[in-house]
Regions:
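N-terminal leader/linker segments that initiate helical-solenoid repeat arrays
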Residues: 1-27
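C-terminal non-catalytic interaction modules
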Residues: 1-11, 189-278
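Structural signature of alpha-solenoid helical repeat junctions
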Residues: 11, 46-55, 88, 92, ...
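"A position-specific structural signal for the A-helix of alpha-solenoid helical repeats
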Residues: 18, 53-60, 92, 98-99, ...
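Short coil/turn connectors between adjacent alpha-helices in alpha-solenoid helical repeat scaffolds
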Residues: 20-31, 60-74, 101-112, 142-150, ...
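Amphipathic alpha-helical segments of tetratricopeptide repeats
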Residues: 37-44, 77-85, 118-124, 156-166, ...
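Alpha-helical adaptor scaffolds
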Residues: 98-109, 124-126, 137
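Solenoidal tandem-repeat scaffolds enriched in leucines and small polar residues
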Residues: 129-137, 142-156, 160-183
Length: 278
């Protein structure tokens, strides 16, 4: 019978953590900071001690500036190591890895960031949404390093995972970033992205590489993007529509350009309008 109060206390602590996270989501950082102090103290000692809650609240406190700047990296690493021991492969473990990888990237430590991202995988049990968020960041890092072929591969992997997870805004972002790279060089004899992913093998390290894109992949991406982007054609800077027009020209598929031309009165980007006139 003595276990019942402990269970009630744990539930209360869970609710307190949820309240803190809700405040953060609503932008009420100051109130969240106050609650986080109580959650931290209660989770790390006494009858309510809970390693998982402690790791979560320490992760959030590191991200909202409650840890000295010089200690943030160490705190994030502590969270990763603790979660690796008690909840390996969970969404929270993946989230901690994502934040540690981002911390390294923001400091210009790109190889450390890539190494941290490599710990996130479906084989380790991480859910596909976390894996996809990792892959899009890896793609961006490799793109910044001029390593275009693997950047395209990781962006495509992220895109596929986002679509599977019904994460539409993220899928659109990954699709556009992949398309921007893919349009640089096109060859109908190039392998498709699915074949490239199937035959991909680890490399010793990044390099500078590029491979032409298969036009069928480009067409698939445009067909996915087109109805989503056409929900609203307004906006003074529509780089996304520019990519659609470029794909229409390079693949010799005027249907996309003609569809935009039929709705040009809705388009505000002068560069897109000029392209439609050409």
């Amino acid at each position: 019978m003595r276990s019942m109060p402990n269970e009630e206390n744990r539930s209360e602590l869970d609710l307190l953590l949820e309240s803190m996270l809700s405040l953060l989501a609503d932008g009420d950082t100051e109130q969240a900071k106050q609650i986080s102090e109580e959650v931290l103290n209660r989770s790390r000692s006494g009858p309510e001690r809970d390693h998982l809650i402690e790791a979560r609240v320490r992760l959030e406190r590191a991200l909202i500036g409650l840890v000295p700047t010089d200690d943030i990296g160490g705190e994030l690493r502590w969270c990763v190591d603790r979660l690796n021991a008690i909840s390996r492969g969970s969404s929270l473990h993946g989230l901690a890895l994502l934040n540690l990888a981002t911390w390294h990237a923001n400091r210009g430590e790109l190889m450390m960031s890539l190494a941290t991202h490599s710990e996130i995988s479906l084989n380790n049990g991480h859910p596909i949404d976390i894996k996809s968020l990792s892959r899009i960041e890896v793609g961006r890092i490799l793109l910044s390093m001029g390593d275009y072929a693997p950047a395209k591969r990781h962006l495509w992997s992220a895109r596929s995972g986002f679509i599977e997870s019904d994460m539409v805004p993220e899928a659109v972002a990954a699709s556009l970033e992949w398309l921007d790279l893919a349009l640089d060089e096109i060859d109908e004899d190039s392998p498709t992205m699915s074949a490239i992913l199937e035959n991909a093998s680890p490399r010793e390290g990044p390099g500078n590489s590029q491979n032409p894109s298969n036009p069928s992949d480009i067409a698939d991406v445009v067909e996915y993007l087109f109805p989503l982007l056409c929900n609203d054609l307004s906006g003074q800077s529509r780089i996304d529509l520019g990519l659609i027009l470029e794909a229409s020209e390079k693949l010799d598929r005027p249907i996309w350009k003609n569809a935009l031309k039929a709705r040009k009165e809705e388009i505000q980007d002068s560069r897109v309008l000029d392209e439609l006139q050409s």
